[in-house]
């Protein structure tokens, strides 16, 4: 791909993902807190629900949600934020999860261990005759089951509390398609949408997060065989490079092509379910 064509695609993708050419942390916090508060009030809902993993994305989204419901209560509208701990058995980074909760200061915290449900599903699939190519493939499938069990738990609480599920997706994860479809990608409201990873970190700092939380190595931590595997190992490039791509900064052509390959391969994750009328590969 020529450089002009590559640059044009970068601009188009950044616009699609709502990445602004400018950024002010205080302004963005105000916009996003107001968005969540307005959404709840307009929809007549009373709660926000979010799983807090111990990473910077869920911590930042959780703090924004907590501030939004506090704003609503100050205006006379009753709303609460429910933070959920959703470990698969013992959590490797338990201390980080506790640090995140201390930053978020949620109205309420519920803990649900997804291990029994995830393991039961894996066993039920085996009993039904599903076989895997190897242990690595089985572990990959189990990882996605974990993410989807967490989604089920959050929606169960949201349903019981007349609330919405808050998602943690932002532009850097979205462009790479780095989320489980109908797992952590399943949510009602995305307060971090349009932000690059460095901007999420800047927003967290402005909101008062401490540096160990802000700078924690991002990991989905879904694989049992490779616990705490950094996101960047899966990408083969860094978040700094992904952010440069989205923010229109100078970068190596090969790195830009890597981002474009991930973007093209994961288009289905950013779309609603296809019909014959809207799938690009099928003439309507």
Curated annotation (Swiss-Prot):
Spell out the family assignment given in the record's similarity comment.
Belongs to the NAD synthetase family.
Q: What UniProt keywords apply to this chain's record, in alphabetical order?
A: ATP-binding, Ligase, Magnesium, Metal-binding, NAD, Nucleotide-binding
Q: What is the designated name of this protein?
A: NH(3)-dependent NAD(+) synthetase
Catalytic activity, reaction form: deamido-NAD(+) + NH4(+) + ATP = AMP + diphosphate + NAD(+) + H(+)
Q: Name one GO biological process term.
A: NAD biosynthetic process
State which pathway it belongs to.
Answer: Cofactor biosynthesis; NAD(+) biosynthesis; NAD(+) from deamido-NAD(+) (ammonia route): step 1/1
What Gene Ontology molecular-function terms does this entry list? ATP binding; glutaminase activity; metal ion binding; NAD+ synthase (glutamine-hydrolyzing) activity; NAD+ synthase activity
The top EC class is: ligase
**Cell cycle in keyword set:** no
UniProt-listed HAMAP family: NadE_ammonia_dep
Functional description taken from the UniProt entry: Catalyzes the ATP-dependent amidation of deamido-NAD to form NAD. Uses ammonia as a nitrogen source.
What InterPro entries does the database record attribute to this sequence? NAD/GMP_synthase, NAD_synthase, NH(3)-dep_NAD(+)_synth, Rossmann-like_a/b/a_fold
| Keyword NAD appears in the UniProt entry | yes
Assembly, in brief, is: Homodimer.
PANTHER family per UniProt: NH 3 /GLUTAMINE-DEPENDENT NAD + SYNTHETASE (PTHR23090), NH(3)-DEPENDENT NAD(+) SYNTHETASE (PTHR23090:SF7)
**Chain positions recorded as ATP binding sites:** 51-58, 168, 197, 219
Q: Which residues bind deamido-NAD(+)?
A: 148, 181, 188, 268-269
What GO CC annotations are associated with the protein? cytoplasm
Stated EC number for the protein is: 6.3.1.5
């Amino acid at each position: 791909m020529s450089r002009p064509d590559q640059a044009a695609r970068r601009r188009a993708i950044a616009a699609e993902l709502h990445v602004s050419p400018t950024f002010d942390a205080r302004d963005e916090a105000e916009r996003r807190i107001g968005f969540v508060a307005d959404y709840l009030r307009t929809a007549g809902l009373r709660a926000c629900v979010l799983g807090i993993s111990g990473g910077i994305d869920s911590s930042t989204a959780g703090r924004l949600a907590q501030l939004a419901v506090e704003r609503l209560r100050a205006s006379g509208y009753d709303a609460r934020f429910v933070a959920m701990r959703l470990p698969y058995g013992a959590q490797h980074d338990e201390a980080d999860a506790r640090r995140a909760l201390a930053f978020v200061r949620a109205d309420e915290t519920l803990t649900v261990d997804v291990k029994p449900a995830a393991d039961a599903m894996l066993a039920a699939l085996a009993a039904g005759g599903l076989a895997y190519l190897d242990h690595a493939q089985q572990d990959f499938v189990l990882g996605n089951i974990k993410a989807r069990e967490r989604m089920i738990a959050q929606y169960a609480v949201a349903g019981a509390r007349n609330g919405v599920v808050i998602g943690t997706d932002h532009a850097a994860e979205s462009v790479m398609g780095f989320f489980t479809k109908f797992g952590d990608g399943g949510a009602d409201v995305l307060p971090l949408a349009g932000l690059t990873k460095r901007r999420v970190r800047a927003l967290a700092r402005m909101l008062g997060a401490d540096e160990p939380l802000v700078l924690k190595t991002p990991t989905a931590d879904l694989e049992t065989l490779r616990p705490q595997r950094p996101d960047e190992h899966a990408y083969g490039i860094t978040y700094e490079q992904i952010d440069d791509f989205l923010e229109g900064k100078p970068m190596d052509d090969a790195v830009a092509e890597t981002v474009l390959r991930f973007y093209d391969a994961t288009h289905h994750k950013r779309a609603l379910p296809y019909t014959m009328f809207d799938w690009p590969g099928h003439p309507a």
